[in-house]
UniProtKB/Swiss-Prot annotation:
GO BP terms: regulation of bacterial-type flagellum-dependent cell motility; response to stress
Oligomer and partners: Interacts with GroEL. Forms homodimers, mediated by the C-terminus of the protein.
Gene that specifies this protein: uspG
Protein name: Universal stress protein UP12
Keyword Iron: no
Top-level taxon in the UniProt lineage: Bacteria
CDD domains: USP-like
Knockout consequences: Recovers slowly from late stationary phase growth, increased sensitivity to carbonyl cyanide m-chlorophenyl hydrazone, a proton ionophore and respiratory chain uncoupler.
Organism per entry: Escherichia coli (strain K12)
InterPro entries (UniProt xref): Rossmann-like_a/b/a_fold, Universal_stress_UspA, UspA
Any one annotated GO CC term: cytoplasm
GO molecular-function term, one example from the UniProt record: protein kinase activity
Its job: Has intrinsic autoadenylation and autophosphorylation activities, probably on Ser or Thr residues.
């Protein structure tokens, strides 16, 4: 079906991502590769000179924690783990999804969405933003 699938995940809210796992696997079927992407907020505005070292250490800690949780998430899939790649980036979900999609020549994005609320108008804010700015098909899973 699809060769390259990007699946943005929040490793600190696994139940949201769990919904999308089976759909991503189905789309990957025979030989597709799923790229799990966790995006941490960028801290450029927090990088005051006298706190830069502390901010850097904190970012490294967050990145390490996210990488460990992504590794745990791989066990939720039934496909061969060699077909699941992991990415941790800093920035906005929307921008990082589009950047990774362009780098990889991705075919589709599979993203979980929260339950409806007034503030997000039926989609989670990340899912909504990804849909509005994506240059490729996006499958939203509830």
């Amino acid at each position: 079906m699809y060769k390259t699938i990007i699946m943005p995940v929040d490793v600190f809210e696994m139940e949201l991502s769990d919904k999308a796992v089976r759909h991503a696997e189905f789309l990957a079927q025979d030989d597709g590769v799923i790229h799990l992407l966790h995006v941490l907020p960028g801290s450029a505005s927090l990088s005051l000179h006298r706190f830069a070292a502390d901010v850097r250490r904190f970012e490294e800690h967050l990145q390490h924690e996210a990488q460990e949780r992504l590794q745990t998430m791989v066990s939720h899939f039934t496909i061969d783990p060699s077909r699941i790649k992991q990415h941790v980036r800093f920035g906005s979900v929307r921008d990082e999804v589009n950047e990774l999609a362009e780098e990889l020549g991705a075919d589709v994005v599979v993203i979980g969405s929260r339950n409806p609320s007034i503030s997000t108008h039926l989609l989670g804010s990340n899912a909504s933003s990804v849909i509005r700015h994506a240059n490729l098909p996006v499958l939203v899973v509830r």
